[in-house]
Amino acid sequence: MLFDAFDVFLFDLDGVIYVGPEALPGAVEALERLRSGGKTIRFLTNNPCMTREQTAARLNRLGIEAAKDEVISSGWATACCLRERRAGSVYVLGDEHLERECRDAGLDIVDVNAAEAVVVGWSDDLTLRDIQSAVTRIANGAQFIATNADWSFPGPDGPMMAVGTAVEAIKMASGKTPYIVGKPYPYMFRQALQHVEDWSRAVMFGDTPDADIAGAHRIGISAVLISSGPYTGYSSARDYRKPDAIIPDLRSLWDEELRIERWIPPAFPWPDDIKPGVAGIVMDERGRVLLMKRADNGCWGLPSGHVERGESVEEAIVREIREETGLQVEVMRLVGLYSDPESQVFTYPDGAATQFVTACFRCETVGGALVRTGAETLDVNYFEAERLPDPILAMHPRWIADALAEESLCIFR
């Protein structure tokens, strides 16, 4: 049973421990039994509008023993993160509770124009002027830190806006990527497990696959979904949102028949998004392959890139090769369609990860002149397929081999 399988129990709050003003069935008794059994308990919440003391007090009013230090809130975790990043002065785009967590962490709350970091939380009094001030300061070099990226939460009359709406507005206007602290991002979970030696004995309980389950899996711990309704599931066993077990409520921790599948992290990071991509294989008259050394990561690789709006994949690869090498090409055939996340998830220097579904084409040169350097390229040259340069993007030698195999059918990998 789950009680015996783990020593450290992490819990989301809303939808797992309580809903509104009421504790969920079995929650009070389950947490009491966990404590009497010597288990470590942590409560995780993305809500930045309550201090840890307030959250612990709310749990105690429901009959659930909880200490401040057992609460890991996105507001408190953000304050810890700012202290680690040595951002002494911060502008808080949030309410007085987030400001208090920052002050308690030794941070100075300052006017936006003097801030080393801008912290995005939430306040019902937030204005467009506040958001514009944050945009300007971040665009001018201040750190961009977000308590979480939740878009909305359920309200009495429908969805209510949450932190993620402000974060996205600032991101789009400033052109800067935020560091996000709360679930499903790793920092908050690491804070919860800060003094835990064996993470394999830790488990997360949540009701949201995208935040609770995926977040736990991103740091390599098991995750259990609380759900009493129909579950449609996820088709891939490697989907980070797929729970290791599903239970209706916390009384199931002592179910003798329940077994949990231990989470084995896949060989790729969980992507933030998925995009269509293209790659092109161009050869010279000696059968050598055209490669470019990318400016963004210093690796050699095939000419490649994104599909723009309004483009076909054929148009996209012709454009990419022209922009990156100066050559004009025509598409000869489709070599393969590549989507396996183990080779197709690419992590950028800012930490963002994208999964590409890449159409790889065999192309021939019909014009243009080779340009060896540019905004995206450090060098461009032809290489024998048996003597590819190093370092080279991991998946590209496989694509080259597929093209040289002269298969008449498109390859799917």
From Swiss-Prot:
Family annotation (PROSITE patterns): NUDIX, NUDIX_BOX
Keywords: Hydrolase
Pfam families: Hydrolase_6 (PF13344), Hydrolase_like (PF13242), NUDIX (PF00293)
Species name: Paenibacillus thiaminolyticus (Bacillus thiaminolyticus)
One of the record's GO molecular function terms: phosphatase activity
Entry protein name: Uncharacterized 45.4 kDa protein in thiaminase I 5'region
Organism domain of life: Bacteria
NCBIfam families, alphabetized: HAD-SF-IIA (TIGR01460)
Cellular component GO terms held in the UniProt record: cytoplasm
Placement of sequence motif Nudix box: 305-326
Positions of the Nudix hydrolase domain: 273-406
